[in-house]
Amino acid sequence: MDSELSSWQKAAQAKRQAILDAIPQKWRIQRPVLPVDVTGKFIQGYLTPREIEITEADAVAITTQTTSGNWSAVEVTEAFCHRAAIAHQLVNCLHEIFFEDAIQVAKELDEHLAATGKPKGPLHGLPVSLKDQFHVKGVDTTMGYVGWIGTYQGKKDDPRHRVAESELVRELRSLGAVLFCKTSVPVTLMAGETANHIIGYTWNPKNRNLSSGGSSGGEGALIALRGSPAGFGTDIGGSVRIPASFNGLFGLRPSAGRMPYEGAANSIDGQNTILSVIGPLATSIGGLKLLFKAILSQEPWQYDPLSLPLPWRDDIENKTKQLISEKSTASRLSFGIMRHDGLVEPQPPVKVAIDFMEHILRDLGHQCADSSQSKIYNLDGGEDLLSHIALSGEAQIPQCSVEPGKHFNAREVAALNVQKREYQKRYMDYWNGTARLTTTGRPVDAVICPTAPHAAVIPGKYRHTGYTTFINTLDYTSLVFPVGNADKNIPSMIERSEFLSELDQKIFGDYDAEIYYGAPVGLQLIGKRLEEEKIITIAEYLCEQVRFYTGQEDLVNSSTDA
């Protein structure tokens, strides 16, 4: 059979087996017919009570224990390595496994704490996972390309292979984090699903009939299974927010320049019209905030020429808290509600989530106002993406396929940049103009809108990224938070006779209440450019309210049950 395989298929198969071989034999599991939902009690069945206690804790709770010495970094690291190994065997979410190196780092952290009485940093002993765009010493960065296996970004015999480390990795190590795995991505990174020829398709842990999202889909799936308490992805069109939404997690798309991108691999590197940004994903809003603040404390602008000199701004956080606590309706926060983007209406579960959030906000005395809503990515006609696929001769993945297109020249790129700037100005004027609609006399403080037209999507049916990509064009801050799960008993919304577009009708026709049942639904909380402190603080408040209104467990310090 192997003799019938092409060279790229053999290379992919060997890499896939190498990933499995990196899992200790004692952590291998037999794969019977799996249930649809492999979260919660199912994956817990492979763990000890102590491992469950550790891995169900969020990043804030873990660092409270590790920095004080109540939990050893080794014990915490081993627990998450075990759970991550199981997670990969259930949903195909890992590209690189370096558990032994992680446990050695954890031992050194324990020795440091014992010798000095002080933690190495605020992330001391915290396991952190990474999307397979970040270079880590000793392991590959394939980004899903078979042609990148055993190379440095497709370059054979490059001395940087398995030696170079991304700036984010260096800073995480300085903060005391324990890096232990890298997670799956779709080839090209330009997809709302995650699939490649190395590990196959990354499934949604809550519903294995559905996608984990993309392009940080491996991060979403792993963290949803509590195989990691928090990690980092990247976002150029929704690639942090979509997996966060599809997996019931928290995900932040900060404005460009807040997180250090130096030394990370990327598709279409050098394309500056819309910048890819790094953002954290976590099981709690507290964990998200912890990671974001910790990286800023390292002053990344000293090491990355594109990072902005903006530390965490306590004054903005405190001012936002003051607005939240205002008793006067005339001074309180106000919100824009974007029900659809003018092209595609969301499917029923997402509509329910939007209506629910508006009900909560109005019930709390906040004003809500309706909010309304290219040729940016393929400036090289897809040439960069196709060239990396061509390195091995591998076939294209249907969800990530790229067709050769027009190669834009410098004049045309400049014209697109002018269009982008004009769009940004129009939207800025529109946002500022909402001051006429609010009782505060201020523009709306934030906008709530869908992350996608659907809950976690049926494979092959991610058809519309409009709810996320416009935010990248604006370079606005966006934070995804979980609201609930799809309910199949919403008959009043399953009939429509009028549609915004042919695509709208097609996406509505994709809806299947039985298949989507139980799928996580998240929404976006959007702020203007560089408003991360404000949006994170508002999200903390909103999560408390969602918990109160739904009776869910504490969304501030742990997400919905996984």
Give residue spans per PLM region.
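Glycine/threonine-rich flexible loop motifs
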Residues: 140-159, 347-348, 456-462
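Residue-level signal for inorganic ion chemistry
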Residues: 80, 102, 288, 335, ...
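Glycine-rich, small-residue loops and helix-cap segments
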Residues: 69, 125, 174, 178-180, ...
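Short glycine/serine-rich loop segments
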Residues: 162, 166, 170-295, 474-482, ...
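A short helix-breaking turn/cap at a secondary-structure junction
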Residues: 42, 253-355, 391-395, 548-562
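Short helix-loop capping/hinge segments that flank enzyme active sites or metal/cofactor-binding pockets
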Residues: 41-50, 124-151, 209, 327-338, ...
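An N-terminal boundary/leader segment
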Residues: 1-111, 363-366, 548-562
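Conserved small-residue hinge/capping positions at short loops/turns
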Residues: 112-144, 165, 178-185, 361
